[in-house]
């Protein structure tokens, strides 16, 4: 388990944390994310194409306007079972204090059952840059220019 470099306020909204489930934590020194669990009362089966908002059982308060949190999918669930986030990425602003809900979508071909306590997403804390927009008529040339999708090729 890694050593935290910053404190994060968390409210436990589900009494199973601490007893049955550990708090979200970085699994290794190099882990960027902390796993979020499905704080369900009973197993939930998502049929192909189904989406659901699944409670994580926690609320966080970043408090620092220079930070945000993102909820990201777990790679194995998406690759092996087609279980991904319904909104792509969940963005948590520094002043949000409500429960973290995980928008979960079964894009796979088979039904998938999520059990209470399953690790279904991950939470990553990120610094943000608050940029002001500067309107210009032209940009300074870059090597890429306006080349868009597929412009740099695959090899």
Swiss-Prot record:
Gene3D superfamilies: 2.70.40.10. Pathway: Pyrimidine metabolism; dUMP biosynthesis; dUMP from dCTP (dUTP route): step 2/2. One of its GO terms (biological process) is dUTP catabolic process. CDD domains: trimeric_dUTPase (cd07557). It comes from the Bacteria. It catalyses: dUTP + H2O = dUMP + diphosphate + H(+). NCBIfam families: dut, PRK00601.1. Pfam families: dUTPase. This is Deoxyuridine 5'-triphosphate nucleotidohydrolase. Disulfide bonds: none annotated. This enzyme is involved in nucleotide metabolism: it produces dUMP, the immediate precursor of thymidine nucleotides and it decreases the intracellular concentration of dUTP so that uracil cannot be incorporated into DNA. One of its GO terms (molecular function) is dUTP diphosphatase activity. Belongs to the dUTPase family. Keywords: Hydrolase, Magnesium, Metal-binding, Nucleotide metabolism. It is an enzyme of class 3 (hydrolase). Transmembrane segments: none annotated. Its EC number is 3.6.1.23. Substrate binds at residues 74-76, 87, 91-93. The keyword Metal-binding applies. Its cofactor is Mg(2+). InterPro entries: dUTPase (IPR008181), dUTPase-like (IPR029054), dUTPase-like_sf (IPR036157), dUTPase_trimeric (IPR033704).
